[in-house]
Amino acid sequence: MELQRRAFLRAGASGLGTIALKSLLRADDSAAVAPHFAPKAKHIIFLHMLGGPSQVDLLDPKPALARFEGKPMPDSILKGKQFAFVPKDAGALASPYKFAQFGESGTWFSELMPHLAERADDLTVVRSMQTDEFNHGAGELFIHTGFGRLGRPTFGSWVSYGLGSLSDSLPTFVVMASGPNASGKSAWGSGFLPGVHQGVKFRSGEEPVHYLANPEGVNRDRQRQVIDGVSALNRLARERYEDPEIATRIAQYEMAFRLQASGPELMQVESEPQHVLDAYGAKPGDGSYASMCLLARRMVERGVRFVQIMLRGWDHHTGIYRPNALPRSCRLMDRPTSALIDDLKQRGLLDETLVIWTGEFGRTPMVQAISPQGFTQDPGRDHHKDGFSLILAGGGTRPGLTYGVTDDFGFEPAENPVHVHDLHATALYLLGMDHTKLTFRHQGRDFRLTDVHGRVVKDLLA
């Protein structure tokens, strides 16, 4: 008993604060395996438009839809396809919005994205995206984990596992959201990877996580002693039980302590010059998408590897063209996203930061009419997995490129299809990782983000 007490006191006296988190994790075989080759990017900012933006209203103009307005799609296109709600004989629905070409690249944007359109020569637009899932929960899981069911690690968790942290005082993987999402915490979970690699959910107010401030009467020195004592007990338990999740618990206590110092400074967006706040449209503490985008830049500056922002409001089954539907979603998104790209570029961070703007899928070129009057009075669009668009910026991608072509209706790729697995493989490549070698042994087999699929789309690279 006395021997155990002495061991505990020695462990507590040493203090976890003197031990690098990276060393702790490496001892548990859950730390970074280092890049496989020279990376072009160090960070990813993943902007997830929850619900699925309509590609034919934003990025992929289809004049043929006007010629076929109200007429069913050809059987040759619809055969074997899956939809969430819309019947297969639904008529084509043309976009009411004007499209134009922008920049030297001549990239097409609709009038709903005027700010992003002005940055056309800094952006890569992929029009030929495909996914396997057409419902929100499974679709969210697929875009984040490469698998449509629960239990797999998310993209950010794989990046954390593969590359480790760039900061000793902030998490490697941070998540911010405008509201609940269909797949819940599984959209940033670590799955079967060690729990230390899961995303940390931040709020965009003054206190990013609950209970960040010490209770009244507890100063930082006292808190350090408590953390060291608890960590010493956990380390003894780790030696006895050899449970890797105990290392996660130790690391989380230590990160929480360090966040007490780094978190408040990170969240003080009011310290930004007024012209920066104005560019984003951000107001300190308002919890808006604009503030999240500004915080994403501040996080990247301070070494956060993977920032995931989730913006609700893109699931328009009916009333898609109401002022408070697609137009409103674009107004909330367009200016802050553009400001983020400008800000990263001006600070020399865009070259090392890959920005991904996407939904979990797109919307059908056909109308979803809830009522007989729906087609003419209040049309919507259903979920669509077979062809949608996304935007990339920075991180070694080719600016000014429009990649992939869909058919005349915007239904599915006619040239250069890009699957979600290909997106993951390409993003990992830009981070210096070979997606076929980034593996984790679980239940007798090696798993990876891209499963047994995926290819690096070299045409997207600068």
Residue spans for each PLM region:
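Ligand-binding pockets and gating/stacking loops
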Residues: 1-462
